[in-house]
């Protein structure tokens, strides 16, 4: 308790921490907690299980509590932040809501971007939330552009998310990254009219006065939101006319100029050039902290930690809420309406509640992105930037928004890029460094070569069910097609997985598969072996963990594995990310991950005190054709086995190349074993040692000692000689050097 109190942690939280048997803070906690309590933005990296969740949860709980306490007692901070700007008093393009290479003329209407590789966009200073409106855009050159409408939630890259509607010079309309043919192309000297009927939920365009017809039906979740005139440019110049000047092609059918919109229908932009300041009034659905996790399991895990840490925090009590998909939203909405202080959730459901106005971001003091590299790899970059843009940068009591980013590694380019965009002079706390394999882990590769191992030809139908990629191909033995070898690899990997379990008499292991379908097929194969979820204690008892399983089933399966009720957890990278499962003796990589960092995440989970962990990777010697869904359904009901470049949903997966990249990343050569998967064992100090990495480095103490032994002996002799000489000096017969 004293150790945490010395860092400034309040006594109530320190008491709860002590009950969890946390006598001393971990390294990441000792570094990060004081920084966050001090009000700074923090980027932290540490291994899973290092206390990273506590490192951000403890200070977040404390500051949220102190904020609520101050409000309860009527205390107010000194706000020196100026808000508002004269730029909002007229219709023009907003210099505070634009891309970095987007230029606006002194009149606020002439716009230009000369960036030839990237799109840069902008929105107007004002928007409208009711009525029928029109504005014109004149093209001054032959560059590329899209014009239209968007909400403040939208990306400045107009038409690439569900909050914006664009029409481009190539004759395409765009919404939510869906580009469809519409109208006709336009270029220099053309004038585009942009129409919106908010009451009836329609958007349309005209070219030089010619009506191009209906372009979009506005979705229900956007009908009550203010929309702003928007554009995005690539090496182009435009000029806007909101109605202060005469239109070249005046609108008909009741549409009026934006500049003539009544005051009751006009909404000023929140992007004013100075920091947004949150409302002083407390709203029940406006939390003080928002913690975003990449998976439901991790969100539940973090929420449980928050509950433990705040156990003794009272008067006022903190209210936390879990917001995740896959469960009924009704209960979550009820709790939101009753009031909430800390929200922990996953991006999908949080995005839904924000877009429908159910979750208010006006009071957020903390934005925490846990496992940020996982969030970015799942494609949530736009979501993160969007919600960060909606959160006021300064609270009503004058405190700045704090952003905390946690990641398994801070050396990812995407994480660095994100931090530069949304964080304010962050402090880096990197206790992980570059990826390396723990010395308690022995990892080996088993080559899967169907040209050498002909077992797959003799199995008939008694093999694992494959993913269906080759259902329409001729994969019968006797040919020499790439498809035949690919199917053979899938079959052999099922056999090698079973062989590895039997050979090493595995009592517990995590088995990583590439896709959810692969996980299901492996589980079914274990059932064929007599195991499965219902066979407790069987050699092949197993449970499955991936996002297609119901949340309750996932939670139950994870608990069963942790309690050793089943031997094997079959899962995907996404499902397993960040989950606190450690000390597992074995990991099997049925397929190598396509991101080399994930390889270290996977194998780092193995190892016990009594023995080293063993990670076995099955690596195909030939290319394997696998699913890579780019379709809107993300694989549900998809049977398009054509390659991605041909409009399909498959790719050729090159594990040999991936292995080379992993070895280069780790600067070591991974040992290879034969298909019988017999891994050489060495005896040392009564413990089983599965082997050593070929790279030189830590752990090779014996050789190091042998090298130093002669020098140590020489030092010992010199020390003895020096001490003997000193003693003799004190007792010389003539007593010239008498000691005192």
From Swiss-Prot:
Residues 2-428 form the Helicase ATP-binding domain. Residues 1-448 are annotated as: Interaction with dsRNA. It catalyses: ATP + H2O = ADP + phosphate + H(+). The helicase domain is involved in the stimulation of RELA transcriptional activity. InterPro entries: B30.2/SPRY (IPR001870), B30.2/SPRY_sf (IPR043136), ConA-like_dom_sf (IPR013320), DEAD/DEAH_box_helicase_dom (IPR011545), Helicase_ATP-bd (IPR014001), Helicase_C-like (IPR001650), P-loop_NTPase (IPR027417), RNA_helicase_DEAD_Q_motif (IPR014014). Residues 70-247 form the B30.2/SPRY domain. ATP binds at residues 46-53. A motif (DEAD box) lies at residues 370-373. GO terms for cellular component: cytoplasm; cytosol; mitochondrion; nucleus; tRNA-splicing ligase complex. CDD domains: DEADc_DDX1, SF2_C_DEAD, SPRY_DDX1. Pfam families: DEAD (PF00270), Helicase_C (PF00271), SPRY (PF00622). The gene is ddx1. It comes from the Eukaryota. Its main location: nucleus. Acts as an ATP-dependent RNA helicase, able to unwind both RNA-RNA and RNA-DNA duplexes. Possesses 5' single-stranded RNA overhang nuclease activity. Acts as a positive regulator of transcription. May be involved in 3'-end cleavage and polyadenylation of pre-mRNAs. Binds DNA and RNA. Component of the tRNA-splicing ligase complex required to facilitate the enzymatic turnover of catalytic subunit rtcb. Binds (via helicase ATP-binding domain) on both short and long poly(I:C) dsRNA. It is found in: Nucleus; Cytoplasm; Cytoplasmic granule; Cytoplasm, Cytosol. It comes from Xenopus tropicalis. GO terms for biological process: double-strand break repair; mRNA processing; tRNA splicing, via endonucleolytic cleavage and ligation. This is ATP-dependent RNA helicase DDX1. Residues 493-681 form the Helicase C-terminal domain. Its EC number is 3.6.4.13. Keywords: Activator, ATP-binding, Cytoplasm, DNA-binding, Exonuclease, Helicase, Hydrolase, Mitochondrion, mRNA processing, Nuclease, Nucleotide-binding, Nucleus, RNA-binding, Transcription, Transcription regulation, tRNA processing. SUPFAM superfamilies: Concanavalin A-like lectins/glucanases, P-loop containing nucleoside triphosphate hydrolases. Belongs to the DEAD box helicase family. DDX1 subfamily.
